[in-house]
A protein has these predicted regions:
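Extracytoplasmic/periplasmic sensory segments of membrane signal-transduction proteins
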Residues: 41-49, 57-154
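Generic short beta-strand
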Residues: 106, 175, 207-208, 214, ...
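Juxtamembrane interface helices immediately C-terminal to a transmembrane segment
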Residues: 9-10, 27-57, 78-85, 277, ...
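Extracytoplasmic/periplasmic ligand-binding sensor regions of membrane-associated signaling proteins
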Residues: 99, 118-191, 196-199, 248
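Solvent-exposed, extracytoplasmic
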Residues: 84-100, 182, 186-224
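Extracellular/periplasmic juxtamembrane segments that couple receptor/chemosensory ectodomains to their
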Residues: 178, 213, 222-289
Length: 312
């Protein structure tokens, strides 16, 4: 009789252990998936916040450039048909926009290579503008901002670059100026990225933005702005998975998670250590294992006594 009790108890307990193990595995899977989806949603929302910041920054500066263009083109052609006329009639407008728009510089590049500019230098000299040109071996027509706008006949936005005077990242927005169908010059504004950087720095999470040459120009972690940092693992993972799709990659032997999306010519990304998901999962797994052991122990004891009672 005792032999039968033991055999039945073993069979019953084996079934119970198997069932509890299956339930624990299923529970672990759903916990992991829930944490994954929750993290993906949070990271995507933070990425959207960065995306909106970049879009607003771009829209604001394009609007400013278009408004400046309209104000200049209100002048008759006779006020714009020579370098001297532009200096005399437009110089005050360039200075006003630089100050009111908090811009690094505002200028018009002419087809003779001269650049009529309102900047900190003109401010120091107490004049509306200064002229960059042959006198200091400068040729506006060879510059990217000039050629890009002149050749495309639309607003041209340069990749981010470090300004030589402020040592800060900035971007140039430029546009060809025409009056009565005649080319006047290329209008440009230099915009510091400090305001965008400050806005992104306040965004929770590890967010950053690449320009169209895959160079980071704004980031929550300012260490990422260092040009020597290799960002190819993130970029390669993004290219393989596409916009707004979660991906994993290795960085310095550490597993990381991320998501990126295109914002015009830029790429906004957010990345985190895989521990953001793995730690809660391992914690949940540990708790489930302990609970499973306790439940199995209780079920073994209960089933043994139940089997013993009904076979006695």
């Amino acid at each position: 009789m005792n032999s039968i009790k033991i055999k039945l108890s073993v069979i019953a307990n084996s079934i119970a252990i198997f069932a509890l193990s299956i339930l624990s595995i299923i529970s672990f899977y759903f916990t992991k998936d829930s944490l994954y989806q929750s993290t993906l949603y949070t990271e995507t929302e933070l990425l959207k916040a960065t995306q909106i910041s970049i879009e607003d920054f771009r829209s604001r500066n394009i609007s400013l450039l278009n408004t400046l263009e309209k104000d200049i083109l209100k002048l008759p052609y006779e006020a714009l048909n020579s370098q001297d006329n532009i200096v005399n009639n437009v110089g005050v407008i360039l200075k006003y926009y630089r100050n009111s728009g908090n811009l690094l510089a505002v200028y018009i590049g002419l087809d003779n290579g001269e650049n009529i500019m309102s900047s900190d230098l003109s401010e120091k000299k107490n004049t509306n503008i200064t002229i960059n040109g042959k006198a200091n071996n400068y040729n506006a027509t060879t510059r990217e901002w000039y050629k890009g706008a002149r050749n495309s006949n639309q607003i041209y936005i340069t990749p981010a670059y470090i300004d030589a005077f402020t040592n800060e990242y900035c971007i140039t927005y430029s546009k060809a100026l025409y009056k009565d169908g005649k080319f006047i010059g290329v209008l440009g504004i230099d915009v510091l990225l400090t305001s965008l950087q400050d806005q992104i720095a306040r965004t929770p999470g590890n967010t950053f933005a690449f320009d169209n040459k895959d160079k980071i120009f704004a980031a929550t972690n300012e260490a990422l702005l260092d040009p020597s940092v290799d960002h190819s693992p993130v970029l390669n993972a993004y290219k393989a998975h596409g916009d707004n799709n979660f991906f994993s990659y290795k960085l310095n032997n550490e597993e990381r998670l991320g998501a990126c999306t295109k914002v015009f010519a830029y790429t906004a990304c957010i990345t985190e250590s895989a521990d953001i998901i793995n730690k809660p999962i391992f914690k949940a797994a540990y708790i489930q294992v302990i609970a499973l052991i306790v439940m199995i122990s209780i079920s073994v004891i209960l089933l043994y006594f139940i089997v013993s009672k009904y076979l006695s």
